[in-house]
Amino acid sequence: MAAKIKKGDKVVVLTGRDKGRTGEVIQVMPKEERALVRGVNIVKRHQRQTANQEGGIISKEAPIQLSNVAVADPKDGKPTRVGFQVLEDGTKVRVAKRSGERIDG
């Protein structure tokens, strides 16, 4: 199945404590059906001290379920579903169902 959400996409969180927040996808994990989104789902982790890194509590992004995010429409930034369209030259591009705008280049 073709990837509807890719690294670098602007996405909107649909559910959870970060509902309505937008961010850029840092990493997609298709086998786990999860994605890392910059600035969303921040958790605190206790870091053990090592020779080159000091210990303490650090904040970092945790993966979020792909079903809980939607691609932001390039036109107005609202969440949209993703469709696919084949151009005349045979290339397949992602299209926002909401506005019909192309998501890929």
Curated annotation (Swiss-Prot):
Keywords: Ribonucleoprotein, Ribosomal protein, RNA-binding, rRNA-binding. InterPro entries: KOW (IPR005824), Rib_uL2_dom2 (IPR014722), Ribosomal_uL24 (IPR003256), Ribosomal_uL24_CS (IPR005825), Ribosomal_uL24_KOW (IPR041988), Translation_prot_SH3-like_sf (IPR008991). One of its GO terms (molecular function) is rRNA binding. GO terms for biological process: translation. The keyword Ribonucleoprotein applies. SMART domains: KOW (SM00739). CDD domains: KOW_RPL26 (cd06089). It comes from the Bacteria. GO terms for cellular component: ribonucleoprotein complex; ribosome. PANTHER family: MITOCHONDRIAL RIBOSOMAL PROTEIN L24. Part of the 50S ribosomal subunit. Belongs to the universal ribosomal protein uL24 family. One of two assembly initiator proteins, it binds directly to the 5'-end of the 23S rRNA, where it nucleates assembly of the 50S subunit. This is Large ribosomal subunit protein uL24.
